[in-house]
Amino acid sequence: MRREFPDAPIVGVGAVVLDGDRILLVRRGRAPLKGEWSIPGGALELGETLEAGVQREVAEETGVRVKVLGIVEVLDRIVPEEDGAPIEGGLSAIRVRYHYVLIDFLCASLGGDLCCGSDAADACWVARGELATYGLAQITVSVIEKAFEMRDAS
């Protein structure tokens, strides 16, 4: 299935990988969001379980192995052809350039050699208190904070 101007939404998985008070971030190497910092993730492959998809995406983008602990958030990202701003409230008369249904998971790091690969231009561990310096989208910050709350409550 093509990612740009798709015929149907694409299921994507994201990983909020925590290691103590640090979180794993990647700088996107491809559209959409090329050049922006975010959590590791990508499109689910045909026949792949959600857990396997999360583990594969994190390993491909960062070299880190993870244990999936649970779902943090389910959301969608719909970007129209025109200006690239997300569509609020659903479909419009504008052609949809990207449409992802995103399932973000809380994950624990199991180790591995940190490196950036495949879809990532960079990867790093960031202290929770330094997140504001990475220009993360507000929804990403909200998902990360929710993941810390989930982890700390268990």
State where each predicted segment sits.
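Acidic, metal-coordinating catalytic segment for phosphate/diphosphate chemistry
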Residues: M1-G14, A85, R95-R97
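A cytosolic small-molecule/anion-sensing beta-strand core signal
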Residues: D19, R27
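Short, glycine/serine-rich, charged loops/turns that create anion-binding
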Residues: R22, R30
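A conserved beta-turn-beta hairpin within the catalytic core of GNAT-like acetyltransferases
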Residues: P32-G35
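The catalytic Nudix box helix
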Residues: I39-V72, F105
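Active-site-adjacent beta-strand/loop module that shapes the phosphate/pyrophosphate-binding cleft
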Residues: L75-D113
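NUDIX/MutT-family hydrolases
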Residues: D104, C115-A147
